[in-house]
Amino acid sequence: MKESQPSGVRITRRSLLCGALTTAAVAISSKVSAQEMQKYLPPRVQPKPKGPLVFLDYDKEEIDLAYDQAPWVPNAREISKRNAEKSATAIARLGEPRRIAYGSAEIEKVEIYTTKKTNAPINIFLHGGAWRSGNARGVAYMSETFVDAGSHFISVDFNNAPEVDGNLMVMADQVRRAIAWVYKNAMSFGGDPNRLYVSGNSSGAHLAAVALTTDWKKDFALPADILKAGLCCSGMYDLHPVSLSASAGYVKFTPEMIEKLSPQRHLDKLLVPIIVAHGALETPKFQRQNREFAAAVKQAGKPVTFLVGQGYNHFEMFETMGNPYGLLGRAVLEQMKLNVACTAPS
């Protein structure tokens, strides 16, 4: 079992964020209360007087803020624009991905970026977007990290929560069926079904963790270890506190959903090594979710590597997966036992 801190992979960043946020990320301790969180926030998001508590010492406004990335990512538009440009460049170099249906619904498609190597491993990526936005094409910029290293890269399209009446069970089922499809059809595009990996960011990391804690033998009549490893970046693994936040405005949380789709409660089904990661400039609640998930995996006796990206906010953190020399890019290639490509993408 391996647990590592990112001291050896820290990357110096330019000072993108306001001083209050930078100070916050450095000062936040391993346990951050709602009261402590208040003093780190920029003036424009300072909470009103405290209301009734809804979770631990968080009131409703504080729990909403704890799961809202907007105040913590002042450069979100710049990141989105940059990634769109990098995605267009990647597709221009690699060519349009093969878009193939894994189910009958119009949205149920995978986009496959193939490597030139035969019988190659496959990384399946699940996009984030707070369960209500995002799509497979939006992470095309990550594809070259894998293709150049000798792996196929597959991004998955699935419904967003508002499209399925707020039911995350539908989205989880789609993701599982997509993975099962890739396993059964891997050889048709030169993939090795016995080297299947899953990765995800934010709400996609939650869905990746759901996939990693699925009983594949019971539910799909597939090998129990269909997935060989996984990477979960900045996800949510216990849905109870999330259900108390503004997310409940578009996700219809139920006790059954919270129980079935909280990966931290099903670690007995986790059979493979995972990487859990978050940025040091993320909200304290996101940091806590990932820190506690990694600790729970370790306590369960399962292999886990825990990474903290110093100087990275929520969006910048998973952006490093689009560079083979980035924190996540290097980590996932090492997890897949692949060499970093000889040349980094421009």
Regions found by a protein language model. Give the residues of each.
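Alpha/beta-hydrolase superfamily serine-hydrolase fold, recognizing
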Residues: 36-346
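Boundary at the C-terminal end of the N-terminal hydrophobic targeting segment
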Residues: 32-34
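Sec-dependent N-terminal signal peptides
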Residues: 18-20
